[in-house]
Each structure stands twice: as structure tokens, then as C-alpha cells.
A protein has these predicted regions:
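Nucleotidyltransferase catalytic core that binds NTPs
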Residues: 1-154
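Glycine-rich phosphate-binding P-loop
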Residues: 154-172
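Conserved substrate/cofactor phosphate-moiety recognition/catalytic segment
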Residues: 168-188
Length: 188
């Protein structure tokens, strides 16, 4: 049996990981379509690479074709998406996995069974848009390979002894690492 997941994964998060892992354990072959547009804030090629790194056992397919007539709510959008999915996968599709409402009509258009996975987001109460709005509040939902994209580096340059603890305190506050005062190494 084959399964399909489609999404933007902008960025991938723990909810996406749960969805993919659930689907992976449900089918023999899983196809994950990473659908990207050139104008999106996180580059599509980067999201595609993240998904490949996160799910090396699955078939990760990058869809870059812009299909404006298939936007949500557009007439026949499911049929248009179903055709794109068939072209990308080229294998029989038995199951469509999603946590969002588009999954059911897409599955119907593909002649597949819809498997809703955590549609109320009770297991992982997060969305990619929430992460884009405030990544640090939702840091625990961002997978390790994705975190560097949101990581900001700060350099504290001072001659003041009073500010020596600042890097350590900043690191503690932002739950990250810091480099100790480099002057100690220069004096050695």
C-alpha cells in the first residue's frame, strides 16, 4: 500500500514529524510532496532538503509548479491537485494523510482513503504559521535540522568586567550556548 502527504512544510515542525511517522508506519511506501512557490518566505529548496534529512526512509518529492487555479476553495482544486499528485508519484495511491480539511476531498479525487491525523492538533498544538510568527516561543516544536534557520547570533564586545556574565545570561535566557570570554585564551 502507498500513502501520500502533501504540504508546504514552511517550516517542518514536530506536528509534521508526527504526521509523517504515523503515515510511514501505516503504509509500505510513503510519498511526501513538498509544495513550494518562489515567493514564499522560506526557500522551497531548503524545505525540501530539511524533509529529506528528517525522513530519509520515505520518498520526498519537490513540487515547484505554481498552480494558481488550485488554491484552496477554488473550483475543482482537488481534481487539479490530484492530477499533480498522480504525475509526481506515478504509483497507485491508497491513502492520503493530513491533519487539515483538504485531505478528505483530495483523497476522494485520488480514489484513496483519507486518514486524518491529529486534526484538532491536540498532540502537537502548533502550526507552521505560528512558528514563522514567533519561532522562539515555539522552539521546542522545531526539529534540530531546522533550528539553525531561526538561530540568531549575538556578539557581546565590551571591556567592562561588569558585563562579563552577559553572554552566559543571554544564553540561559534564550536556551542556547555561549562562548566564554576570549581574553582568557589570549593571555595564555
Amino acid at each position: 500500500m502507498n500513502g501520500v502527504i502533501i504540504g508546504r512544510f514552511m517550516p517542518p515542525h514536530r506536528g509534521h514529524q508526527y504526521l509523517v511517522e504515523f503515515a510511514h508506519n501505516f503504509v509500505d511506501d510513503l510519498y511526501v510532496l513538498v509544495c513550494t512557490l518562489s515567493a514564499e518566505p522560506i526557500p522551497g529548496e531548503l524545505r525540501y532538503r530539511w524533509m529529506q534529512e528528517l525522513f530519509p526512509r520515505d520518498h520526498i518529492i519537490h513540487i515547484t509548479e505554481e498552480i494558481p487555479e488550485a488554491s484552496r476553495g477554488a473550483p475543482n482544486a482537488e481534481q487539479i491537485w490530484a492530477q499533480s499528485v498522480r504525475e509526481a508519484v506515478q504509483e497507485p495511491i491508497h491513502h492520503v494523510f493530513a491533519s487539515e480539511t483538504y485531505g478528505s476531498p483530495l483523497a476522494e479525487a485520488l480514489g484513496a482513503t483519507f486518514v486524518p491525523v491529529d486534526p484538532a492538533r491536540e498532540i502537537f498544538p502548533v502550526s507552521a504559521s505560528l512558528i514563522r510568527q514567533d519561532p522562539y516561543t515555539h522552539w521546542s516544536y522545531i526539529p534540530e535540522p531546522v533550528r539553525p534557520y531561526f538561530t540568531r547570533r549575538v556578539a557581546v564586545v565590551t571591556g567592562s568586567e561588569a558585563l562579563r556574565p552577559a553572554p552566559r545570561l543571554l544564553a540561559k535566557h534564550f536556551d542556547t550556548v555561549f562562548v566564554n570570554d576570549y581574553r582568557r585564551f589570549l593571555r595564555a
